[in-house]
């Protein structure tokens, strides 16, 4: 990717160039947080067809559907260390900019609810490795969603209502995912305090919480 006119070459350092891997046999730890996203992945047409992938229309962040849905049908993957895709980051107009996350929060909510319900429906049909992989991807996405409301949305009354409603929704639809993200200190803290600090001033209170955690240990 390129940021401030400086380029960084992204590689999956623990994967061998041109080697074919069986997804169910690999130890996911070798990926070290370097997962397969739209900018670094391509699928055979047949896999896209059999997966039934149909992206939400007129919606931001649907790349997350591409990151998850075809993965349920793929059995093997081959890594090619090629410089094909150039991604420019840090631009204000990007949908990944946090201000735009806040502005487009309804898009993000629509997308992540779709993913949660999709995964809940098909998870029992997946291998344990695929379930773990997809849950890792969903955990990253859920972290972003909670951050939008707990830290960045300056409309605190709206943020409070949205995150309380979403948290209850997640508990109802997929308790395992709900419990999985409880490992994140700021989510656990906000749940314990019933998100009241989001209503007051989310970012300041969550920053204070993170500082307190460093000094005094886990909440």
Please describe what each predicted stretch is:
Residues 38-39, 53, 71-74, 79-80, ...:
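Gram-positive cell-envelope targeting signals
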Residues 82-91, 97-126, 144-174:
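Catalytic core of nucleotide-sugar-dependent glycosyltransferases
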Residues 150-219:
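Membrane-interface aromatic/basic loop that binds lipid-linked glycans or pyrophosphate carriers
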Residues 27-28, 116, 135, 164-167, ...:
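Generic detector of well-ordered alpha-helical segments enriched in charged/polar residues
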Residues 1-80, 87-103:
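Donor-binding/catalytic cores of nucleotide-activated saccharide
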Residues 125-131, 178-182:
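Short, surface-exposed acidic
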């Amino acid at each position: 990717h390129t940021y401030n006119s400086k380029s960084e070459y992204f590689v999956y350092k623990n994967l061998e160039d041109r080697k074919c891997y069986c997804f169910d046999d690999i130890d996911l730890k070798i990926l070290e947080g370097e997962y397969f996203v739209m900018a670094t992945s391509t699928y055979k047409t047949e896999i896209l067809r059999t997966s039934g992938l149909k992206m939400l229309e007129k919606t931001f962040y649907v790349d997350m559907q591409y990151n998850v849905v075809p993965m349920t049908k793929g059995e093997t993957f081959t890594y090619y260390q090629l410089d094909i895709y150039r991604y420019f980051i840090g631009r204000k107009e990007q949908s990944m900019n946090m201000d735009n996350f806040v502005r487009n929060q309804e898009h993000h909510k629509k997308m992540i609810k779709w993913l949660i319900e999709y995964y809940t429906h098909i998870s029992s049909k997946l291998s344990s490795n695929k379930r773990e992989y997809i849950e890792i991807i969903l955990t990253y996405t859920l972290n972003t969603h909670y951050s939008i409301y707990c830290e960045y949305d300056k409309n605190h009354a709206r943020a409070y209502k949205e995150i309380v409603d979403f948290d209850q929704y997640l508990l109802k639809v997929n308790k395992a995912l709900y419990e999985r993200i409880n490992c994140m200190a700021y989510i656990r803290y906000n749940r314990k305090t019933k998100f009241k600090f989001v209503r007051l001033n989310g970012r300041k209170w969550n920053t204070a919480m993170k500082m307190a955690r460093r000094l005094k240990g886990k909440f």
